Amino acid sequence: MTVDLRELAEPGSPEELLVRRLDFDRLPRHLAVIMDGNGRWARRRGLPRVEGHRAGVRAVRETVETSARLGIEVLTLYAFSTENWRRPRVEVWTLMNLLKEYVRRELVSMVDHGIRCRPIGRWRELDRSVVDILEEAIEATAGGDRMTLNIALNYSGRCEIVDACRRIVADWAGGKRADIDQETIGEYLYTAGLPDPDLLIRTSGELRLSNFLLWQIAYTEIWVAETFWPDFGRRELYEALLGYQDRERRFGGVSAADAEPSGQPAAVSDGPGSGS
């Protein structure tokens, strides 16, 4: 693919040195991000937690723009989980308003750059004002064919699987289904029709999945950045992509270096969890 490096880094910058090392034909088709660390970023600066969320919007904007310019097909951002309702009311209120503000401000840009906005999760249970702006974005960006932007809102990986099972049962009762397999379940997930994530980035150094895309990340490569989300920029994104390209995805098999020579019997393993 053809990429304009001038859109990805300033000439002579550290980011340019990183982006020149990327193999643009081996980028992830689907990139997922757990945007973590806003509160700790604010606390280290003596600021209220909500200021960390405001600062995090810049990282969202830059990650979306850069991913689209790189040619990544799908970007999924974990914006608000079902567990986040436990946070202070003022923090939840701020998050919802920042979401509405971001979508309003970026809507024209998303349309111009061919970005399709697709909320996932139980987002229709949010406040009516949030639902309205999301529905407007869905309609306005429906023709976007450059990148799909999934925004996970009121999202839970377990709830996603439960919702999929409920819909399957309902269709089965209506005579629409004869059997259930992995492919069937995939067709009923929030991300139906999209490839599973190739790379999951989590910021802030935490080693948790936080109930995110539990079905879809079975074979996803995971990159943990020590950076808090508000400080996550192009450099950190390029480092994660380079780390991804340095890995060999085996999907439960063995690497070429570890494969048995032709004609030699393979050793018996203790199961899929044995060895590395």
What is each residue range found by the language model?
Residues 1-276:
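Flexible, compositionally biased loop and terminal segments
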